[in-house]
């Protein structure tokens, strides 16, 4: 990416509505161009798709970095599955953090088994007490993501020191393109 493309890039943050304030909220006020969305575990796949599309429609930047957490991962992937190729081309990188296995409902078209990420993607889980590693590895392979472990524990839903580790990961992903 050229430097001017990085300057105009939007950060699309999709948070888990079931979580209290955390690092993703700090990112929302720390980045110049941000669009946010929330996903609730009680919503259906079609409601997630509508919610994410509504937020996505407000993004004018040509280049978009996506960061989703918890149920937000499910909502984003449900939306991505039905997104057209021109929309997918706007995605520069994706970071999926602590997806919840129970928040990936099976549907008649197998959305979460068929979706593929079209750009550099990291699936980030905690080193301990979080998303099961074996399950996460299978999902990473299915979604064309690279599985990474955060040096933290649990659902990665705290302040995490502003989550500098994640910002560094995003920067490395963008600059390596």
Name each model-derived stretch.
Residues 2-64, 152-154:
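Active-site catalytic motif of lipid deacylating hydrolases and related acyltransferases
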Residues 1-11, 91-93, 168-177:
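Flexible, membrane-associating and regulatory peripheral segments of lipid-active enzymes
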Residues 80-84, 140:
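A conserved amphipathic alpha-helix that caps or lines the catalytic cleft of carbohydrate-
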Residues 146-177:
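C-terminal catalytic histidine-bearing segment of alpha/beta-hydrolase fold enzymes
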Residues 2-3, 101-151, 158:
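The feature captures the conserved acid-bearing segment of alpha/beta-hydrolase catalytic domains
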Residues 65-68, 94:
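Conserved alpha/beta-hydrolase fold motif
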Residues 86-102:
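A conserved short beta-strand
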Residues 67-80:
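Gly/Ala-rich beta-loop-alpha elbow adjacent to hydrolase catalytic centers
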């Amino acid at each position: 990416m050229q430097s001017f493309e990085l300057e105009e890039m939007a950060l699309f943050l999709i948070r888990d509505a079931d979580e209290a304030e955390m690092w993703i909220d700090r990112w929302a006020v720390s980045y110049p161009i941000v669009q946010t969305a929330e996903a609730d575990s009680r919503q259906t796949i079609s409601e997630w798709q509508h919610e994410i599309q509504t937020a996505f429609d407000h993004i004018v930047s040509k280049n978009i970095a996506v960061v989703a957490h918890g149920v937000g991962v499910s909502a984003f992937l449900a939306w991505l599955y039905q997104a057209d190729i021109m929309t997918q081309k706007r995605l520069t990188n994706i970071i999926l953090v602590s997806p919840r296995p129970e928040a990936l409902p099976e549907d008649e078209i197998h959305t979460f088994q068929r979706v593929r990420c079209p750009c550099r993607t990291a699936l980030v889980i905690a080193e301990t007490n979080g998303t099961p590693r074996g399950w996460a590895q299978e999902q990473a392979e299915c979604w064309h993501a690279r599985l990474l472990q955060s040096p933290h524990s649990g659902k990665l839903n705290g302040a995490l020191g502003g989550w500098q580790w994640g910002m560094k990961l995003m920067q490395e992903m963008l600059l390596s393109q």
